[in-house]
């Protein structure tokens, strides 16, 4: 098979990148690419470790003059998001990608490219392969299944690592240094409720037309949470009309801002017009409040089929109080990085069925103690309402370091090479760096990478010139880490 990237510079980087594109390596299909990395290390006499998950660690001694320098972790992930167009003939279990070079970009015909994070692996292999690149002792870590929940990093044996400085090459915008990320957890609330026979009329209350979005990346857009709006309407109705709740539901994922929610109410037939007026008044309020962020919000109350069971009024009150009091939205902004959401909570899933209230909130914070504070508040509310909290899916924060020698050194290298100051950023979502920081006390870490466009889609492409500049930066960074 002829090589498509052989004329591109840096030759070693693009050589290894093309090798990787010939090995199927979608998430949960990483054995072959993991074995490739192990064979690479053994052929060069390097120390190598491979675990049952297919994570790989390769160690290389320091070059001359760097023997006394602290070791450095160079990290990326082996898996890619495997997506293709309907007409693509590629079989991701056995076929190589069909690479294309157009102008300044490398892409794959009809499929994702896997630049996220194949370019990190290719750069690390090129460093390991070279006898000319100056560097401290290296601990190269290739994790797996990052794209489906960072499963490889979650199961990594961190006792194999001694370094406390780390270069993560898993960012998609050149010139941006990511230096912090949120930790998170899912807060699962369960509250038992009491039902009783019911002979009242029923109405269906719906809140819809919202935009929704990702609860980490878009929590700062000011968009409404349908579950919270549902609670406000129920409270407004309850203040003037006696009703009993039959059921309620809103949201499908805890990490998505719900764009719709509904509830079935049991009430007297003669109260139906007044309840409809209250719903209309709430809609008017919401449209005013969210005119800029969520202008499509609608609230409707329509007749529904009769039911023979409903929550008691006391149980209904507990549900309404939960929706009014549960933490939601931005809890704190960062004092270190302007514009960064530091702590937030999103009630992504809410159900009342079979006399049980079930709610799942996504809790995020780049400060571990604040994440615990929010979980404690949800726990306290749950207990006050006769329920319980179960925390799942917890992952650690990568907390911002006000003093970071590594960040300072890398910024100096970047400025020296480009004449520009790197942009320092943090994200309100989880990264593998957070798992490393949680397991390696004192870790000083920076994430960077070349320009990748439309990752995780069949339009994905990687800038050749940006790879060249990022490679030059990586070499300069390794050279600068002499102390």
Question: What do the predicted segments below correspond to?
Answer:
Residues 13, 335, 342-357, 362, ...:
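Zn-dependent metallopeptidase/amidohydrolase metal-coordination segment
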Residues 223-248, 400-443:
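Active-site-adjacent substrate-binding region
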Residues 136-226, 234, 238:
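Fold-level recognition of mixed alpha/beta catalytic cores in primary-metabolism enzymes, strongest
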Residues 66-164, 186, 190, 199-202, ...:
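Active-site metal-coordination/substrate-binding segment of hydrolases
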Residues 159, 223-240, 269-274, 318-324, ...:
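His/Asp/Glu-rich mid-to-C-terminal helical/loop segments that flank catalytic regions of hydrolases
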Residues 18-22, 264, 298-310, 348-350, ...:
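A short beta-alpha structural unit
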Residues 3-105:
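Acidic/His- and Gly-rich active-site-bordering loop/insert found
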Residues 254-333:
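A conserved active-site cap/scaffold subdomain adjacent to cofactor or substrate pockets
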């Amino acid at each position: 098979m002829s090589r498509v990237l052989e004329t591109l510079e840096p030759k070693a980087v693009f050589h290894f990148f093309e090798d990787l594109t010939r090995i199927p390596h979608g998430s949960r299909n990483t054995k072959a690419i993991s074995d490739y990395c192990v064979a690479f290390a053994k052929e060069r006499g390097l120390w190598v470790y491979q675990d049952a998950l297919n994570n790989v660690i390769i160690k290389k001694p320091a070059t001359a003059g760097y023997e006394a320098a602290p070791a450095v972790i160079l990290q990326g992930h082996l898996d890619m998001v495997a997506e293709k167009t309907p007409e693509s003939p590629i079989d991701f279990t056995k076929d190589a990608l069909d690479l294309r070079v157009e102008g300044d970009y490398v892409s794959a015909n009809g499929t994702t490219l896997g630049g996220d994070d194949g370019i990190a692996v290719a750069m690390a292999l090129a460093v390991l392969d070279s006898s000319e690149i100056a560097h401290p002792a290296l601990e190269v870590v290739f994790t797996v299944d990052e794209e489906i929940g960072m499963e490889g990093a979650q199961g990594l044996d961190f006792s194999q690592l001694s370094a406390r400085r780390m270069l993560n090459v898993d960012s998609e915008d050149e010139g941006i240094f990511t230096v912090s990320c949120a930790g998170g957890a899912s807060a699962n609330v369960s509250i038992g409720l009491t039902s009783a026979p019911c002979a009242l009329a029923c109405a269906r209350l719906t809140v819809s037309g919202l935009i929704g979005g990702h609860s980490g990346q878009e929590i700062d857009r000011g968009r409404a949470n349908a579950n919270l709006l549902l609670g406000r309407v129920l409270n407004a109705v309850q203040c003037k009309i006696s009703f009993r709740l039959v059921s309620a539901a809103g949201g499908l994922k805890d990490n998505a801002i719900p764009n719709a929610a509904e509830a079935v109410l049991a009430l007297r037939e003669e109260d139906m017009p007044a309840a409809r007026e209250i719903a209309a008044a709430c809609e008017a309020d919401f449209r005013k409040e969210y005119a800029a962020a969520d202008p499509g919000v609608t609230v409707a109350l329509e007749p529904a089929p009769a039911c023979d069971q409903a929550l008691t009024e006391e149980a209904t009150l507990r549900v309404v109080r939960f929706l009014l009091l549960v933490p939601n939205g931005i809890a704190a902004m960062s004092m270190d990085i302007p514009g960064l959401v530091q702590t937030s909570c999103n009630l992504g899933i809410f159900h009342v069925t079979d006399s049980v209230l079930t709610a799942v909130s996504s809790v995020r914070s780049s400060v571990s103690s604040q994440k615990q504070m929010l979980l404690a508040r949800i726990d306290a509310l749950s207990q006050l309402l006769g329920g319980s909290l179960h925390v799942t899916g917890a992952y650690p924060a990568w907390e911002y370091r006000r003093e970071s020698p590594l960040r300072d050194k890398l910024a100096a290298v970047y400025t020296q090479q480009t004449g520009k100051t790197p942009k320092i950023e943090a994200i309100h979502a989880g990264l593998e760096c957070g798992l490393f920081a949680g397991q390696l006390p004192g870790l000083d870490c920076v994430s960077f990478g070349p320009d990748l466009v439309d990752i995780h889609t069949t339009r994905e492409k990687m800038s050749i010139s940006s790879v060249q500049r990022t490679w030059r930066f990586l070499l300069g960074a390794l050279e600068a880490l002499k102390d």
